[in-house]
Amino acid sequence: MSQRKARLSGAILIAFCLALLPCGCEGGGKSRPMGQRIEKKAESKSRLIVLPLQPQGGQAYNGIGLGVHFLLGNVVALHTVFKEFWFGWRVKKIFPQKKKLIAHCRGKDPRLDIAKLGKEQDIRYWLWGSVQKQENRTKIVLVLTDTKGESEERTTELILDPADQLIGFRKGFLTWLDACGFTFPDAQVAKALWPEKTTLKSLDLLGRDLEKYYLHASWGDKSPFDPELFDSAVSEAPFSYLAHDLKGWVRYRNKDYQSAEKSFQSAVKINPAGLGAISGLMWCAVYTHDVEKAYKWAMAKADIRGESREAARVSVDRRIKKAFQ
């Protein structure tokens, strides 16, 4: 009997102590703004994908929507609350046929079933929207969808002005992300605001070139690109990080690794935290079997995202082994 009393007293004491602890339930009665959540391990970070922006209903197609998509993809890649993730990795999964991607970029497709795609592709957050020309200015409408349905879609309207190197547009985007619950880490803000010296014409050319790249790369076209077709955006905006970065990937796709490296180096001089170009430099080093250079760029990328240098080195070893099997 005394043993039973002792056990009962112990259970009561434990229950009393637990009652004093602060409640940690994630599903409490209060709703949380999009993005606000209990801290999770790095491996459980969610993905955010940036879709090509579409022309506002009734407006003619140009490449600006794809150009802004490329800009935002490079910004979001710096946000360490998300896994690094690029639209180019899933083009064919989202648009199974070339004509579907082409129609989407022109605003002539049915709206994507983002909830279904999110579940299929394990992509929780989707950023999409439209471009609207208004006399002498360009309005960008952005929508952020949480496919787990824990909050409503969030929408914002921003003005795109190349005169300030697209910094005002990006500051507005970061402010909106903060309102959605995805505050950009202080250490990453300056990296997201590199001077993108471009023009609307260059963004148009860049977007048209990017569409060609996606179509060629995603559907296994074996013929090489004509790199001269991708010179126009760089010629129009010679100090544009985005233009040099895309040209690097075109040359990389052609397996012209030396020329690709030059383009990526030009991009990194403009934007030292450009993850796309730094990834390109790493891959050029992998395929030229320059192990030390591959380590250098992989670790630079890890530093920018606050990730493990050792894991970056291990990843390079694995990639080199796979590339030369």
PLM regions and their residue ranges:
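A structural "domain/chain start" motif
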Residues: 25-81, 198-215, 238, 249, ...
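Short beta-strand->alpha-helix linker/helix-N-cap micro-motif
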Residues: 40-114, 126-135, 153, 194
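Catalytic-center loop of serine/cysteine hydrolases
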Residues: 35, 92, 96-207
